[in-house]
Amino acid sequence: MKKIVFTGGGSAGHVTPNLAIIPYLKEDNWDISYIGSHQGIEKTIIEKEDIPYYSIASGKLRRYFDLKNIKDPFLVMKGVMDAYVRIRKLKPDVIFSKGGFVSVPVVIGGWLNRVPVLLHESDMTPGLANKIALRFASKIFVTFEEAAKHLPKEKVIYTGSPVREEVLKGNREKALAFLGFSRKKPVITIMGGSLGAKKINETVREALPELLRKYQIVHLCGKGNLDDSLQNKEGYRQFEYVHGELPDILAITDFVISRAGSNAIFEFLTLQKPMLLIPLSKFASRGDQILNAESFERQGYASVLYEEDVTVNSLIKHVEELSHNNEAYKTALKKYNGKEAIQTIIHHISEA
C-alpha cells in the first residue's frame, strides 16, 4: 500500500483542494495522513474526514514588521524537527503540499527524509510559503497557466484547480424548496468570503429594489452581517454562510457575484456559472485576487468590477451586462474541463 502525507493550512483555501483529491486516493487504497498546526482550521476540517492528523509547531511567515517575527522563526525550526520525526515514522512515498505557513516545515522535513514533495499553487503568483517550499520540491502544480512565468519551468505543471466532487452534485429541486424561490426569475448568488465584505453587502442591499425586479437573490453575507429588516423580503434570502446546502444553491444559480479567491472561482468555472468578480483591493491583500479576476475576464469567464468602483449603479450595470451576454460567457466557460485537474495531479502523485 502506497503512503501519502498531505499538508496545507492557515485558511480553508489551503485545505479544500486537498479534500478534492483525497477521495480518489482512498478509492485506490492509499494510506493517507495529514500534518498541520495545533490550532489551525485545517485540524477542524481534516478531523471530520476520518484521516489521521498529526500536529506540529508552526510560526507564521510575514512580509511585514511584527514583534512575533522574533519568536516565529524558532517555531518554524521546531516545526521542521516535529515534521522530520513524524515523516520518518510514517515513511510516506510522497508529500503533497497546498501551501500556507504550516506547510513549510512539513516540506523541509520531507526533503530531509528524501521523500518527493509536490506543491500546488492556487494563485497567479506564489505565496511566501510556496516560494520557500519550492526549492525543496520536485514539482509545482499551478492553477493559472500565466503562473508558469513566475516559476522554474522544469518544475511547473499546469493543472487548473481540483474541485470537490460534492460541489458538482447539487440538486435544483432541493434548492427551490430550501430557498422558497420560483422558476420564473433567474437566481444570482452573492458571496463575499467567510467574513463577508462590507462594501459588497451594503451596495447589494441598496440595489435590491432594482435587482429584485428581474432576479432572485441568495446573499451569503458573512458572520454577523445579517440585516433583520430584510428577513422576509420576497425573492431575497440571506445567510451568514451555508455548508451542506451550497451545492444545491449553486445548482440553481444563474450568475455569481463574488470575491476572486482562486478556489471559489474555479468551482464556479467548473460549474459553468458566469461571474461578476469584485476582487479584494491591493490595500487589503497582496493583489492576487485582482490578477485572478483579470485572468478570468481575459478568458471570457467573468466581468470584473474593482472595489473602488463599486456603486449601486455600477453593480446594476455589470449585472445587466452579465445577463445580456450570458450565451457568450457560457460558450467560453464550456471550454474548461475541470475534471482534468484532479486526474493530472493524481497521475503525478502516483508517478512520484
From Swiss-Prot:
Its EC number is 2.4.1.227. Transmembrane segments: none annotated. The gene is murG2. It is found in: Cell membrane. Cell wall formation. Catalyzes the transfer of a GlcNAc subunit on undecaprenyl-pyrophosphoryl-MurNAc-pentapeptide (lipid intermediate I) to form undecaprenyl-pyrophosphoryl-MurNAc-(pentapeptide)GlcNAc (lipid intermediate II). Keywords: Cell cycle, Cell division, Cell membrane, Cell shape, Cell wall biogenesis/degradation, Glycosyltransferase, Membrane, Peptidoglycan synthesis, Transferase. It is an enzyme of class 2 (transferase). This is UDP-N-acetylglucosamine--N-acetylmuramyl-(pentapeptide) pyrophosphoryl-undecaprenol N-acetylglucosamine transferase 2. It catalyses: di-trans,octa-cis-undecaprenyl diphospho-N-acetyl-alpha-D-muramoyl-L-alanyl-D-glutamyl-meso-2,6-diaminopimeloyl-D-alanyl-D-alanine + UDP-N-acetyl-alpha-D-glucosamine = di-trans,octa-cis-undecaprenyl diphospho-[N-acetyl-alpha-D-glucosaminyl-(1->4)]-N-acetyl-alpha-D-muramoyl-L-alanyl-D-glutamyl-meso-2,6-diaminopimeloyl-D-alanyl-D-alanine + UDP + H(+). UDP-N-acetyl-alpha-D-glucosamine binds at residues 11-13, 164, 194, 289. Belongs to the glycosyltransferase 28 family. MurG subfamily. Signal peptide: none annotated. It is a peripheral membrane protein. One of its GO terms (cellular component) is plasma membrane. One of its GO terms (molecular function) is UDP-N-acetyl-D-glucosamine:N-acetylmuramoyl-L-alanyl-D-glutamyl-meso-2,6-diaminopimelyl-D-alanyl-D-alanine-diphosphoundecaprenol 4-beta-N-acetylglucosaminlytransferase activity. Pfam families: Glyco_tran_28_C, Glyco_transf_28. The keyword Signal does not apply. The keyword Transferase applies. Its main location: membrane. Pathway: Cell wall biogenesis; peptidoglycan biosynthesis. GO terms for biological process: carbohydrate metabolic process; cell division; cell wall organization; lipid glycosylation; peptidoglycan biosynthetic process; regulation of cell shape. CDD domains: GT28_MurG.
